[in-house]
Each structure stands twice: as C-alpha cells, then as structure tokens.
C-alpha cells in the first residue's frame, strides 16, 4: 500500500515458474486483494506447477485464514507482530504448526522480538518503516544480534543489490525476501535470474 501499482501486467504462472528456474528458494505470493491486488487463486494456480515452498503473504488475523492457507496449498504463513498481540502470535503459530505449516514472524522493532515463541520457525525483519514507508536495511543490521540464534533470520524489503545481501549475511541472515525490486522490472524473471547469478 506504500506505492502505486507496481506491475499490473504480471503473469503469475510465468513469473513463479521463472523464479523457480532461477533457483529461488521459495515464493512469496500476496493474497491480499484490498491493498496489494492479490488473490487466493494466485496460489492455487501455481501450487501444482512448482516444487519450491510457497509463503502466503497476507494479514493473518484468525484461525480460519490458517486453515484456508493449508487448503490453498501454502507451505508457510506470515504473522505480522505489528498487527497482533503476543498471545495471538503464540496461539496462531501453534495452530499453524498443527497443520504442518511453517511460520514466519515479521518484526519491525526491538520491542517485537518479545513476540517470539517456540512455534515460530523464522524471524523476518522488515526494513520498511510502517509509518513513513521508507526502507533501510540498517533495521536488519541493528536487530540481528538481538534475535536468538535458534531462529532462522531473513531480511525483508528494501534489498536491491547483491552487495546488500553479502553485508546482511555477515550479520547472520539466512535468507532474503525480495519482491518489489524484481516486480517493478518489465521482466521480473530476468531481473531475478541476473540478481541470483551475482551471489
């Protein structure tokens, strides 16, 4: 919601297959329609066509959405600490685990590290300031040492160069969620492929 439409002509199946061929570790598929123009059908369309994990990226607020995510074919769900209480994170993540779904907890600040619990698999540090919608990878750098080593760490948003990837790896990041940097390109698949070749 921080920017206008990025790529209205994007073909979901073409792009996701291309990302897989480019050796992406997984796919993040937006299903929120109001703010991002995504849909649940985007997951069902590609589920049987690709063999890498799918993250359903949406505002997950209740158990129904978790059951829905499983039925759509998602492998991973995203819980956003800024949208939930600690208790909700714990309950929803445990519920997700009962369906054999992996859980990413997205955090933006030091305070939200306290939301971590044993049913979280991955911590995603979002580099986007939710108030100003500006991105700064220093957010990931600043929070890296505060996140317990028992969790996988990924850095989200604002990553546009391989140099930033190498820097974040030095701070212990295991993965990176990159969306806009590829999707704003006329050929997202080529942009992804070229980026990964630099790593």
Where are the language model's segments positioned?
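Alpha-helical hinge/cap motifs
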Residues: 57-58, 73
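A short alpha/beta connector and helix-capping loop motif
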Residues: 66-83, 89, 93
